[in-house]
Amino acid sequence: MTAFNCLLNKNFAIISMDTLASDSISKKPLKFVSKIHSIPHINCIICGTGSLNAIYSWITWVNQHNIMSINDLNHLAENDMPNILYRYKDKTTIYMFGFDEKSNELLGFAYRSEKHYKSEKMKYSFCYKPTEMYSTNSESIMTELENNIKNNTIEEFLFNLMKKQKEYDDKLPTNKKVGIGGICQILILQHDGFNLINYKKFNDYNKIKDKLVKNNEIL
């Protein structure tokens, strides 16, 4: 699992995710990975939460086929994604973003394993997960978001939000954790392309990195 935060409107998408991959049961850190992936020739972004193997399988499939737009991709996903990803048992959601061929407005789609990867068109809004730390006061996060948009500090807002998500997640029992860490990556998708940055590292980045190197899990 992972942290996933996304602001959508008709002209752009701003997405932030962390880079820590953990074992689905023990939540032991396994590696650092990039979870936001681009398909530049159609100005499309694919990312997801849950099974990395499922997400990577779908990205590989997309790159093996002749696709001209997010419209094509969504149509193919509705038909083919369930057949490709049925073998992966972990709860998984795949997100795809791009611009409509006719209106040139941004489209976002979610495909959830528990709904057999049925295509769901996303609303223009701000979505975030995990959500529990704001479950009793969801209005506060929207107020923070609006203030940061006005002040042109959206990247810092997304990083601070993810820090809160990580702090909350780190305190949970192992079977409740999603596992958040590494680097906060932020992507901005617009009509003329996209920009992906490694915004900031979390405080325990070096500690986890040292453990992975020591255990020969990355070299």
Model feature map: region roles:
Residues 1-219:
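N-terminal nucleophile
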